[in-house]
Amino acid sequence: MGFSTADGGGGPGARDLESLDACIQRTLSALYPPFEATAATVLWQLFSVAERCHGGDGLHCLTSFLLPAKRALQHLQQEACARYRGLVFLHPGWPLCAHEKVVVQLASLHGVRLQPGDFYLQVTSAGKQSARLVLKCLSRLGRGTEEVTVPEAMYGCVFTGAFLEWVNRERRHVPLQTCLLTSGLAVHRAPWSDVTDPVFVPSPGAILQSYSSCTGPERLPSSPSEAPVPTQATAGPHFQGSASCPDTLTSPCRRGHTGSDQLRHLPYPERAELGSPRTLSGSSDRDFEKVSPSEQGPRMPPENCGGSGERPDPMDQEDRPKALTFHTDLGIPSSRRRPPGDPTCVQPRRWFRESYMEALRNPMPLGSSEEALGDLACSSLTGASRDLGTGAVASGTQEETSGPRGDPQQTPSLEKERHTPSRTGPGAAGRTLPRRSRSWERAPRSSRGAQAAACHTSHHSAGSRPGGHLGGQAVGTPNCVPVEGPGCTKEEDVLASSACVSTDGGSLHCHNPSGPSDVPARQPHPEQEGWPPGTGDFPSQVPKQVLDVSQELLQSGVVTLPGTRDRHGRAVVQVRTRSLLWTREHSSCAELTRLLLYFHSIPRKEVRDLGLVVLVDARRSPAAPAVSQALSGLQNNTSPIIHSILLLVDKESAFRPDKDAIIQCEVVSSLKAVHKFVDSCQLTADLDGSFPYSHGDWICFRQRLEHFAANCEEAIIFLQNSFCSLNTHRTPRTAQEVAELIDQHETMMKLVLEDPLLVSLRLEGGTVLARLRREELGTEDSRDTLEAATSLYDRVDEEVHRLVLTSNNRLQQLEHLRELASLLEGNDQQSCQKGLQLAKENPQRTEEMVQDFRRGLSAVVSQAECREGELARWTRSSELCETVSSWMGPLDPEACPSSPVAECLRSCHQEATSVAAEAFPGAGVAVLKPHALGKPWASQQDLWLQYPQTRLRLEEALSEAAPDPSLPPLAQSPPKHERAQEAMRRHQKPPSFPSTDSGGGAWEPAQPLSGLPGRALLCGQDGETLRPGLCALWDPLSLLRGLPGAGATTAHLEDSSACSSEPTQTLASRPRKHPQKKMIKKTQSFEIPQPDSGPRDSCQPDHTSVFSKGLEVTSTVATEKKLPLWQHARSPPVTQSRSLSSPSGLHPAEEDGRQQVGSSRLRHIMAEMIATEREYIRCLGYVIDNYFPEMERMDLPQGLRGKHHVIFGNLEKLHDFHQQHFLRELERCQHCPLAVGRSFLRHEEQFGMYVIYSKNKPQSDALLSSHGNAFFKDKQRELGDKMDLASYLLRPVQRVAKYALLLQDLLKEASCGLAQGQELGELRAAEVVVCFQLRHGNDLLAMDAIRGCDVNLKEQGQLRCRDEFIVCCGRKKYLRHVFLFEDLILFSKTQKVEGSHDVYLYKQSFKTAEIGMTENVGDSGLRFEIWFRRRRKSQDTYILQASSAEVKSAWTDVIGRILWRQALKSRELRIQEMASMGIGNQPFMDVKPRDRTPDCAVISDRAPKCAVMSDRVPDSIVKGTESQMRGSTAVSSSDHAAPFKRPHSTISDSSTSSSSSQSSSILGSLGLLVSSSPAHPGLWSPAHSPWSSDIRACVEEDEPEPELETGTQAAVCEGAPAVLLSRTRQA
């Protein structure tokens, strides 16, 4: 994370960073003392929050997150510690931390795997300048985390057992019971009870008293009254590193309360719990579980917990808990032992960071390690417990409170003097008050004296800062005690059955008309800070009856709902602040909140939806803090619980609300101002109104009405359940069962109709309703509720009537059913009697039927016995096949033939030979009958078919690994060998030669011609070598003889072995560094038709073989079809020849092993490719299924209408291609990873769709950013997806890049020797195809950016490459962006456009048919030359200087291939034209050497008008001295499509000087491609200009270039101008 300062130097900017660092340290040290122990954890969590949510801006993180979080955490700490006033905490950071263990986290624990029952607390951002407390736990589905927002009103009861019970009751899932605590790299699991029970420090008197009683057995106080002065109590099992007294310590009595009073309040610990002394030694049964990455790093050392190690914070001196350190040695033997936090015990490596800046410079990972659960050792606890006896207590005590921290010995008067109204510093009392009540924080000055007298202590009086007060009274504790300890009590937040509501802004939700509200929102947490708070922080049970609220608060009449309405029809709630009730300690925010929620549920739904108007009468008495907190919680929610608040104050009051206040209220200073909102007739007598209202009558009416309504609801539920029980019945089968059902039915109806509640309602309900109508209060609310009760009573009558009717119908059905069952039973009896009578009359027929049944049963039994025998044989065969398949394991060709391998092979061979040979025919017959026992044995057939192959491999591997005379080799065991061959012939498919058809299989192994001498390999169509496979057991010559044209083929094969002079390699596997002219072999050549194609090849024009004595040339480019990109990278066009030569001894076993078995790394790469392919298809289908229908919606924005193809491109076609074709290809290559390259090459054309997609992607992004993101965001929220549509649309581009990486990994592994040359070549070519797709989309976008071009670029062939060059023309230099097409080379000038992509201004272009090239110019290796026709002047020559040698090599290679392809194409067209004109086509040519150039040969095709090398060849070409002379050939070409003759392309090897270019001539008519560099695997396309500023400076300004004739206007001359392709030229 970086900080931005105004000064970039090291002065003020460095000071700003230091001040920011100091401010962050002060804030964190005030929240998490001792900071030396917690710095490692909290600094790293703050660092992660700043990086993830604030873009690394530390200042923004401080103001937007840390300071609001500090206010929320201080409020939480005050509320939690309020009930322990007068006690000194052993861990001063409780409940936020316990020494080094952090309880309330600042960041999400991303790296921790939550288990069911685990949870942790975290403070998060909740909008602008506010924070909230959330509880995070495992979601219901177990796939992520869900969060529960903790309402601010519940902060006082968070660290109690009742809070967790409430959360578990709302979740209705696995109960939460374990809290996660963090300490550096470790995550500890602690029971919630251990976290909620703090540890206290004993006073010296208590320590002496406990020490004096140490000699005897421990004595528990018999009653709370026996407990001594409130000193210290250890309240349960403790955290590691905590200290406690091992002796019996007493618990404090609560000051000013009896025991019965205490036990009423749920958030407080029971008196028995506080009174029972607990020591650390007795708490080992509930120690923490710890999640610690102990395997990956050293455990965090315990930090110094002594008081001397704590650094007081000068800025927050008053907010910091005071340290109590006892150094008196009381004589306890354990006091002289070294405490666990001794600095000498700290390990050398420091895992924490002393400052925020250090954490930035040296970050430490948190939570990313593997979890390991283990119990925390008890020894650390006992060691920590010894320290308390010595008095060496941890440094800080107790919590942040609403008042300032002072010396415990200071008197209240001193406190009063210190905190005057003029003090507004950061340490003032009001700084820790809740953020929610800022708008009511200014107090009237006239009431401060009375408030100070009303408070027990003066340090809560007004004026600490302009905030924290409602109508003049401090929002803090109204019931304070003298500052004897560091704490001050807050009002007791009573958590009843469904306690509190949320005070978090925007999180209150109520939708149930009857009153109950939603449970707290638990949505899957998106794991990022600042997620907007969810809605619905209510407890599940809103009070529904008057008995469910605090009776004392209700009976007091300080909060009433008279039933009046304001001028807009909203219900009015009146609150009086003139009551002693508000000064009592138990007047809590929770009780008032529940009462207001009850009031809100009383009006009808239309009025309830408008919200309440709360009128607070704060005249002559300020409002209590409970009122402000309750109203803030109810107002800041999405559901309109409270619509507005009217605050009636005295006229002399100076109170005004803040503009930035979260609580919005209207301050009125007179009743006349109140009448603007509420009419006087709608106000009670308390507010000088005329509305008649009696609070006692209202309570009585509500009690009677609610009791009656509750009885009606209970009766309705009872009747509905009875009705359901009538409809859920079993179907009886006999008359007896029907009779039992009738009895049960009658009994149930009797019980229902005689129910006491139902009887009383039916008898007395009308009377009760009449009495309620007579006592009706005359308000809208009473009328509405009475009407609702009447409808409930009417519904009871309806339910009774419906039940009686249903019961009567059911009873009639049962009666009919009983009659029918009786009739059926009688019929069955008669049928049985009739059958017995017939059997007696005809016994002979009965005996025959019995005999037939016995015979059939015997046949079934015999068939079952036969099947049992067959199953037994199948079982034995299956075991045999499994044994055979287990032999495959040791036969790994990668394993070296060491002694263990040889021993394993021998044991497998012995096991194989132990199987009787006669067992195989029967097993084979059984295996090969799949219909015998059905489909389940198909796998056994596969295993059986592997047996001969495995047996053969076993013997071969055994003979190679360890030749032993005792083991018979393959040649000495003819029976087994013959059996293997016979099995393979019977059960394997015959060998098939590979075809280049794109629809072929994923891998088709070719067959070696093992019958030939030296095992020559047959070459396929594209120069592919047919690889030897498993079918090497056949005789290939016998197979060839059975094919069409077999005789000629075998003759040629036999002849080739004698004339071959070098071993055969695939062209892709040849060393690429050698010039391709060395592939032209001087050998006797011949032509072989393809065996599987018959006479088809004889008439194909694209395989024309030319034979000459000593020279072999093949041309395959007679058609207009362009070669695929991978063929350009693999080999030049001249390499597609059909030739045979013999390899140099390749062992079949080695070849077979290399092809069948790959390394585990290759299999892993292939598995990753298949798995990611499936995921990629799933993502594309996800977009199609969910986002495509959005474009058909009626509310589609106008900017998106008709833009479906612009946004999504050809995404659907990509999905169909990958799902229907490419995934199947990859799955077929799963066991043969090296064949995956062929799959890519087979679908090269389909991969071109990615170019179209990439070209469309910028338009899609622009449309989404302007219109689509907001529109599709709703669908994303509906799906609950973390990724937006733009992320999914980026997946195709990422997928192509992933293909390139995976292919590179495959190439790296295959180059270790597992792959043959052809497989490596295919993988390299596949990589070229994929990289081309990545680059070509950008190239097409750049092509669209060409401006001012008068040439149709779409007709110039494929764009091959583009780049920036320094172009030299004469003495001028220009920086040009050059585009190279198949038929055109274009020069343009780059023009920068601010805020957009670059555009290219067209300058000039030339047809590639009219240019020649000199490959090297000068000695730099970066320059090459392009020239035109006969170069009459120097301006006809362009020298291009590349930015690197790789770019130059790639361009010269591509241009060379283009020139040669055009020359060969022209030659083929010329030959065909001459043949059609009757001139004839002579396949053979005469090669005549010249006397002057022995190294050159002139090849003439005897065609008329063909120029032959003559004396026109200049001496500078023939006898060059500056460069070595090489053999030259020439190609004659003409363009018959144009009205002019196409110039001849003359390709020479070198020219010695620039002047030699003017004297070039035609060398001949036949040219052979002799490339100087290998095919470049990929062409570099610059995203930015590779030229530095100094190079650009030396390039002259753009001037008008000389007009050059383009290739479309070629001169007509008899000699036909020539174009040279030369090797080198000295600059």
Curated annotation (Swiss-Prot):
GO terms for cellular component: basal plasma membrane; cell-cell junction; cytoplasm; cytosol; extrinsic component of membrane; nucleus; plasma membrane. Residues 1070-1081 have a biased composition (Basic residues). GO terms for biological process: axon guidance; cell-cell adhesion; regulation of small GTPase mediated signal transduction. Residues 1161-1340 form the DH domain. SUPFAM superfamilies: DBL homology domain (DH-domain) (SSF48065), PH domain-like (SSF50729). GO terms for molecular function: guanyl-nucleotide exchange factor activity. Residues 211-349, 381-475, 501-537, 959-1008, 1049-1111, 1124-1159, 1519-1558 are annotated as: Disordered. Subjects to autoinhibition, mediated by the N-terminal domain. This is Pleckstrin homology domain-containing family G member 4B. It comes from Homo sapiens. The gene is PLEKHG4B.
